[in-house]
C-alpha cells in the first residue's frame, strides 16, 4: 500500500479491504499510521482493524487477534547485481520453511551466516525481517534499521547496504522502478518461523464481532477468486491464501 501522486492510498490491500467492506455492508475509512505505532494505535481505538501487510505471528497474537490469512509472500534478500553476494546458492534450496527443523534448513542458515558474515543488512524496524536477523544472524551481520522499506531500498541502490531483507513483493516493486534496476534477489525465499503464517488483519481481542465479519468476507473472497485476482493485478502473480 502506498500514496499515489494525488495523495490517495492505493494498493492490493486497499482494493481487498474496500471489497470486503462492501460485502460486509459497512462504510470503511482508511487511516495512515507509522509502522512502529500501528498496534498501540489499534489498542488505543484509533481504528478498528489493521490491514497493512501484517504477518500473523505468535508474538503479535499475544496483543491482538488475527483474521484468517488472506495473502502470503515470502521474504528474501536483495543485493546489487555486481555484489559478491549476488547469486548465492544456499544449500541448493530455492525455498526455506523455518517451520521445518530438518538438517537442510539448519544447513541453509549456517551457509547464509557464512556468506554474509560482517556485512551490513538493512531492514525495516519492528518487522519480522528484523526478528529473523536477530534470531538467526545475530553477531554475524551488522543490522541497520529503517522506518520505511523505501528508505532502505534507496540505501541499497546507493551502496550503503550490502543487502536488504524484505517481502518478495516489495523488492520486486523496487526492482521494476528506475531506482532498482541494479538490484537482484539472492539466496532462497524464507517462510514460516518468525515470518509467520501469512498476512492477516489484526483486531482488538474484545472485538469478536468485527473479527467474525471480516473472516466471513475473507472466506467468501477466497472462495470466489476475488483475492487471487486482486493480488495478480498488483503483484503479477497469485499470492492469495
Where are these regions (language model features)?
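Short, solvent-exposed loop/turn elements at domain surfaces
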Residues: 1-3, 59, 85-87, 131-132, ...
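Extracytoplasmic small-molecule ligand-binding "clamshell" domains
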Residues: 1-54, 62
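Extended ligand-binding regions for polar small-molecule ligands
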Residues: 11-24, 81-103, 120, 127, ...
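Short helix-initiation/N-cap motifs at beta->coil->alpha
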Residues: 14-15, 29-40, 105-109, 143-158, ...
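A local structural motif
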Residues: 21-32, 115-117, 135-148, 160
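A conserved helix-loop-strand patch within extracytoplasmic ligand-binding domains
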Residues: 26-29, 34-37, 55, 62, ...
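A ligand-binding cleft/hinge motif common to bilobed small-molecule-binding domains
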Residues: 37, 53-63, 131-137, 150, ...
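Periplasmic-binding protein-like
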Residues: 72-76, 168-216, 237-241
Amino acid at each position: 500500500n502506498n500514496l499515489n501522486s494525488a495523495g490517495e492510498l492505493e494498493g492490493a490491500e486497499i482494493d481487498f479491504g474496500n471489497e470486503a467492506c462492501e460485502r460486509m455492508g459497512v462504510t470503511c475509512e482508511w487511516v495512515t499510521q507509522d509502522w512502529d505505532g500501528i498496534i498501540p494505535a489499534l489498542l488505543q481505538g484509533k481504528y478498528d482493524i489493521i490491514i497493512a501487510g501484517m504477518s500473523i505471528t505468535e508474538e503479535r497474537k499475544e496483543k491482538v487477534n488475527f483474521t484468517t490469512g488472506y495473502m502470503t509472500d515470502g521474504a528474501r534478500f536483495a543485493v546489487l547485481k555486481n555484489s559478491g553476494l549476488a547469486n548465492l546458492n544456499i544449500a541448493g534450496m530455492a525455498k526455506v520453511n523455518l517451520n521445518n527443523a530438518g538438517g537442510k534448513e539448519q544447513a541453509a542458515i549456517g551457509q547464509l551466516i557464512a556468506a554474509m558474515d560482517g556485512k551490513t543488512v538493512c531492514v525495516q524496524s519492528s518487522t519480522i525481517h528484523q526478528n529473523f536477523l536477530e534470531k538467526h544472524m545475530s553477531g554475524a551481520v551488522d543490522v541497520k534499521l529503517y522506518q520505511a522499506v523505501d528508505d532502505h531500498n534507496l540505501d541499497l541502490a546507493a551502496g550503503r547496504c550490502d543487502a536488504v531483507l524484505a517481502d518478495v513483493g516489495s523488492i520486486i516493486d523496487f526492482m521494476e522502478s528506475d531506482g532498482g534496476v541494479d538490484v537482484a534477489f539472492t539466496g532462497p525465499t524464507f517462510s514460516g518461523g518468525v515470518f509467520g503464517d501469512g498476512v492477516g488483519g489484526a483486531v482488538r481481542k474484545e472485538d469478536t464481532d468485527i473479527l467474525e465479519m471480516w473472516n466471513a468476507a475473507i472466506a467468501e473472497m477466497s472462495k470466489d477468486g476475488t483475492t487471487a485476482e486482486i493480488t495478480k493485478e498488483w503483484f503479477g502473480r497469485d499470492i492469495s491464501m
